[in-house]
């Protein structure tokens, strides 16, 4: 807990310093319509597996985990640009550790609501992987200690506070789904369910613009 508090204080002090620097900077605001900027971002926050999880003890849903993400993206204010993102999720379900990964390209639309507030919507399509680590648990087609590969989709929307020309702090809400393909004999679930796993979440984001 002490480390978390110290980290929050450090981030807060950086934000104040960046804001002070921005107010003293008389250069033209780079975040205007038509401007193309590169962004490197890191994010962390809670997430929930919102598809059914079948175990030897019954069905579970909305299982909480932790989401980590890194994204390199172009931001065209008032337009669409592209990027690439990687996300990793860890969820513990009654002793079963489920690891989910996503990597793929994305398209991002950005809109400047105010001189200091930037909105973003992203859509991605890429590779998804899943792995479960407990021999008595399964999540749909997730096999124990075996990495499952599938088609991953990502939809995200967020808001960014532009602390300076190069620093931003934001909040993202996202939905990710991994489709594993055709069902087989190892599938756990109802006949009308897809063979896949989905999760929703919210993350705090640190942006570096250049």
Residue spans for each PLM region:
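Short glycine/proline- and aromatic-enriched beta-strand/turn motifs that initiate or cap beta-hairpins
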Residues: 19-86, 201, 205-210
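Outer-membrane beta-barrel and related beta-rich outer-membrane complex signature
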Residues: 54-56, 96, 133-135, 183-185
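Extracytoplasmic loops and strand-loop junctions of Gram-negative outer membrane beta-barrel proteins
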Residues: 51-53, 90, 138-143, 186-190
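Predominantly the C-terminal beta-signal and adjacent terminal strand-loop region
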Residues: 23, 158-210
